[in-house]
Amino acid sequence: MSRLFTLVLIVLAMNVMMAIISDPVVEAVGCEECPMHCKGKMAKPTCDDGVCNCNV
């Protein structure tokens, strides 16, 4: 039973470490998806050089 508990603790510790170490990736939204991407933010979508910008 203690081996199982130790294994669970190791797995949980590894998950926490991976969450801390991994940096958040900013998803680039293309011009095609721009209107749907900005719709939830109540912003006006504009596309500059293939990159979506949501202007409030």
From Swiss-Prot:
Transmembrane segments: none annotated. It comes from the Eukaryota. Residues 20-28 form a propeptide. InterPro entries: Scorpion_toxin-like_sf, Toxin_alpha-KTx_8/9. Expressed by the venom gland. Belongs to the short scorpion toxin superfamily. Potassium channel inhibitor family. Alpha-KTx 09 subfamily. This is Potassium channel toxin alpha-KTx 9.8. It comes from Buthus israelis. The lineage of its organism: Eukaryota, Metazoa, Ecdysozoa, Arthropoda, Chelicerata.
